[in-house]
Curated annotation (Swiss-Prot):
GO terms for cellular component: ribonucleoprotein complex; ribosome. Transmembrane segments: none annotated. This is Large ribosomal subunit protein bL9. PROSITE patterns: RIBOSOMAL_L9. NCBIfam families: L9 (TIGR00158). It comes from Symbiobacterium thermophilum (strain DSM 24528 / JCM 14929 / IAM 14863 / T). GO terms for biological process: translation. It comes from the Bacteria. The lineage of its organism: Bacteria, Bacillati, Bacillota, Clostridia, Eubacteriales. HAMAP family: Ribosomal_bL9. One of its GO terms (molecular function) is rRNA binding.
Length: 146
């Protein structure tokens, strides 16, 4: 049987497993969790696996290119502040993501911005960006008075 989904105690999606006839006939096949391991099904699973790998490689290439474009750049933000450079409120990862999105001209997910704590002072702050697939970068965020 070729599993079409993860099945606890049996295997993971795409694996070829041997199971009892009754288990396959009464549980796996009716629920759409597995198909019989025929030549066509094996080819189909292999093609699906290759497509998934190619998609992941494209994503890694795109994220690496974005990291190379942003790494070491200075992103400017304007915020209202009071005496001594203290901000009214703070600059959050959403604010940084919005500024990066304006800088690169396309949407940027705030979950990629890693702040230890919200920024509460004017000046330049080093911010880590986590793109996924173990790709990280750093960007300087310069907070200027509004």
């Amino acid at each position: 049987m070729i599993l079409k989904a993860d099945v606890k105690g049996t295997g993971k999606k795409g694996q070829t497993v041997e199971v009892a006839d009754g288990y396959a006939r009464n549980y796996l096949i009716p629920r759409g969790l597995a198909v019989a391991a025929s030549e066509g099904a094996l080819r189909s699973i292999e093609a699906e696996r290759k497509a998934q790998q190619e998609k992941q490689q494209r994503q890694v290439a795109e994220l690496s290119a974005l990291r190379d474009r942003l790494d070491g750049q200075t992103i400017q933000l304007r915020a209202k502040c009071g005496e001594g450079g203290r901000l009214f409120g703070s600059v959050t990862n959403k604010d940084v993501a919005d500024a990066i999105a304006r800088h690169i001209g396309k949407p940027f997910d705030r979950k990629m911005v890693e702040l230890d704590a919200p920024i509460k002072t004017l000046g330049v702050h080093l911010v880590t960006l986590r793109f996924g697939h173990n790709i990280t970068g750093k960007v300087n965020v310069e907070v200027l008075p509004e």
